[in-house]
Amino acid sequence: INHDPDAILLHRTNHPYTEHLQASVWDVDPVEVCKGRPVGLAWFSPDCKHFSKAKGAALVDRNIRGLAWIVLRWAGTARPRVIMLENVEEFQTWGPVRKGKPVKAKAGQTFLRWKQQLSALGYKIEHKELVAADYGAPTTRKRFVLVARCDGKPIVWPEQTHAPID
């Protein structure tokens, strides 16, 4: 599910047997899309530009900044056994916005509330900051990765496959 036709085209090229929906995530009904089938894994990568330290001085759009709330909709309706979310490390500072700017004194409050609500839906949650290059990706950027499970199985993090050059 993505609103961007270029993103859909790229994904369709790499995953031709996957069903693709070009739509806003807010307009897609998880129950309808899943057609009663169980969901093993749901992956979420909400827009990071409103959290990233590289964003500059642009004003914050609450609708985009709040995209991670869609995770709770899926968790509460389609109930994926495993949920993964990746974003920039600053995602953990998600908090209230006033006059188009994050309220620094309340940094992280929305993130904590969001995690509490996901936990209340029966998910065990763990998150880490990982460097993608340690796992073979051609970037040294640090990424926030969250894994949530509701199937009673442990969360197991992969071992690093690549090491930094000394």
Describe each region flagged by the PLM.
Residues 1-27:
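SAM cofactor-binding core of SAM-dependent methyltransferases
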Residues 1, 23, 44, 85-86:
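Active-site flanking residues adjacent to catalytic metal/cofactor-binding acidic residues
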Residues 28-41, 48-166:
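Class I S-adenosyl-L-methionine
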